[in-house]
Amino acid sequence: MAGKRKRANAPDQTERRSSVRVQKVRQKALDEKARLVQERVKLLSDRKSEICVDDTELHEKEEENVDGSPKRRSPPKLTAMQKGKQKLSVSLNGKDVNLEPHLKVTKCLRLFNKQYLLCVQAKLSRPDLKGVTEMIKAKAILYPRKIIGDLPGIDVGHRFFSRAEMCAVGFHNHWLNGIDYMSMEYEKEYSNYKLPLAVSIVMSGQYEDDLDNADTVTYTGQGGHNLTGNKRQIKDQLLERGNLALKHCCEYNVPVRVTRGHNCKSSYTKRVYTYDGLYKVEKFWAQKGVSGFTVYKYRLKRLEGQPELTTDQVNFVAGRIPTSTSEIEGLVCEDISGGLEFKGIPATNRVDDSPVSPTSGFTYIKSLIIEPNVIIPKSSTGCNCRGSCTDSKKCACAKLNGGNFPYVDLNDGRLIESRDVVFECGPHCGCGPKCVNRTSQKRLRFNLEVFRSAKKGWAVRSWEYIPAGSPVCEYIGVVRRTADVDTISDNEYIFEIDCQQTMQGLGGRQRRLRDVAVPMNNGVSQSSEDENAPEFCIDAGSTGNFARFINHSCEPNLFVQCVLSSHQDIRLARVVLFAADNISPMQELTYDYGYALDSVHGPDGKVKQLACYCGALNCRKRLY
């Protein structure tokens, strides 16, 4: 495993007692921020944006002071849904034009996941479709215009977890219809073709006359089947819309994208859709179907020279997961946690000639150990909710989170988006252990495996799907003062708790601009001469949990989230890893260690360098 001094990301500007001069400077900055917010909201309104706040808040007559000058108004309060819409608009202002195509796809899907979870939190019907609608309004669809052939950034084997995800990217723009096609609005661009012209089909097994032999497919056209009942054909199909579009593809030798959908119990939507590449429409005809009605048939042939099909791997992924540890190839440890975790974590090693176990010289623990010279603050008062926190207007913990809950009660709790800091309910709160605002405190929910990799040492992967926003684990070890571990050489498992530094953007760290209320009495000094150095760290060198085996990636699928639950001192925040994307089974779990290049120095003061073997398309080739 690559050597690392891990870095956490964390919260917003901390308030503290300060001089009158400093208070005036801060108030001036807050006033300027309020003015900019008002201007931005008004700009969105002037452009008739669908995602701005209500007009009644924007066009109220400005109040005046006694001297006739206009009073400074606070920016209008926004709901969580409105904030999400504003940030969606701001995040799509053209700054990402230079991103690689696959990174654009990843970012687009993350935006959709956020909108989807916001709609779930707002208890809207069909939150997946509402999420797509919000992206359409914000002009956030990655490929809004239909494209023939492969879409940049979406390779053969790419997995979607819902039809709405495909719509959000612009891969297949019909959430229900199996055939996506260009209508007559494209006639100027495709004047040499007859329209409509098909660009994509999704095979979901809804038609009784379909015949799928992988490379060769007999596809049944659209229309005439019972959508709500047994899916059987109930009337004749017509040669129109998608059916006519496939006919034109056959006549003009235009390939179509083929995506197969399958039931999958471990997927959070119970479905998974795999892109299987481009197919040529070789032939079409009309015939009487199984139910006696006329259906249109299309023979599709997969184009040569494409990567191998992966749908079967997805469809039968459960078959690759052993039912007992005795079936695991290369097993070196049945459970590295020794029964401490709710789900056992096996370890496998098929790399070394003499396989070794990751537990050698390592003690597994489930909770943090605190060094004697580290003083943990007293527990905060907490909220007065009962059972589960549901009313964000009354819950004290929700108020700390900016007036809304950071989690949505879906799939046992999912974080809507990354924040500077998340305030969870703690030991003195009135709610119970099932409260959604205790999501990261719950037991291990996924079947994981520690495995030996060829270049990166030990690594971690999941045997099942992990939905975006799900907590995977907390980084566990011994909490020490950073100054006490600086003399320990070759310790690769030090995680600096630099939430305070990140929230102030110190040392090149990137802030997360979130609406949180960091308490004034956290005891943190912002004027320290050594403010770039975190005061505390987590040492998992010889004692810790499986999080120590999670590797770095320049394009990670996890992110670091600082969480406060038992107290409100961000210097000692809990470090929790959450899923940034919907993660497929057997995919390695990774996060960004956060090193800046040339930031690590040896005992001689010289810059140390370490190669990165993450394998990402945009790997920067060096860890530090």
UniProtKB/Swiss-Prot annotation:
Catalysis: reaction(s): N(6)-methyl-L-lysyl(9)-[histone H3] + S-adenosyl-L-methionine = N(6),N(6)-dimethyl-L-lysyl(9)-[histone H3] + S-adenosyl-L-homocysteine + H(+); L-lysyl(9)-[histone H3] + S-adenosyl-L-methionine = N(6)-methyl-L-lysyl(9)-[histone H3] + S-adenosyl-L-homocysteine + H(+)
Region named Disordered: 1-25, 54-86
Binding sites annotated in the UniProt record for S-adenosyl-L-methionine: K456, G457, W458, Y493, R548, N551, H552
YDG domain segment(s): 149-302
Key word Transferase present: yes
All residue ranges annotated as the Post-SET domain in the record: 608-624
Subcellular location: Nucleus; Chromosome; Chromosome, Centromere
Residues the record lists as binding Zn(2+) 4: C554, C612, C614, C619
GO molecular function terms listed in the Swiss-Prot or TrEMBL record: double-stranded methylated DNA binding; histone H3K9 methyltransferase activity; histone H3K9me2 methyltransferase activity; methyl-CpG binding; methyl-CpNpG binding; methyl-CpNpN binding; zinc ion binding
Binding site for Zn(2+) 1: C383, C385, C389, C395
Binding site for Zn(2+) 3: C389, C425, C431, C435
Superkingdom, natural source: Eukaryota
GO terms for biological process, alphabetical: peptidyl-lysine methylation
SET domain ranges (all copies): 446-594
GO CC terms, sorted: chromosome, centromeric region; nucleus
Binding site for Zn(2+) 2: C383, C397, C425, C429
E.C. designation(s): 2.1.1.-, 2.1.1.367
Pre-SET domain boundaries: 381-443
Tissue: Expressed in leaves stems and flowers.
SMART domains, per the entry: PreSET, SET, SRA
Other noteworthy facts: Mutations in the KYP/SUVH4 gene decrease the level of histone H3-K9 dimethylated, trimethylated or dimethylated in association with H3-K14Ac by factors of 4,3 and 3, respectively. The level of monomethylated H3-K9 is unchanged. Such mutations lead to a drastic decrease of cytosine methylation at CpNpG sites, causing the reactivation of endogenous retrotransposons. The KRYPTONYTE methyltransferase name was given according to its involvement in SUPERMAN gene silencing.
Domain notes: Although the SET domain contains the active site of enzymatic activity, both pre-SET and post-SET domains are required for methyltransferase activity. In the pre-SET domain, Cys residues bind 3 zinc ions that are arranged in a triangular cluster; some of these Cys residues contribute to the binding of two zinc ions within the cluster.
Role, per record: Histone methyltransferase. Methylates 'Lys-9' of histone H3. H3 'Lys-9' methylation represents a specific tag for epigenetic transcriptional repression. The silencing mechanism via DNA CpNpG methylation requires the targeting of chromomethylase CMT3 to methylated histones, probably through an interaction with an HP1-like adapter. By its function, KYP is directly required for the maintenance of the DNA CpNpG and asymmetric methylation. Involved in the silencing of transposable elements.
Assembly mode: Interacts with H3 histone.
Protein name: Histone-lysine N-methyltransferase, H3 lysine-9 specific SUVH4
Organism per entry: Arabidopsis thaliana (Mouse-ear cress)
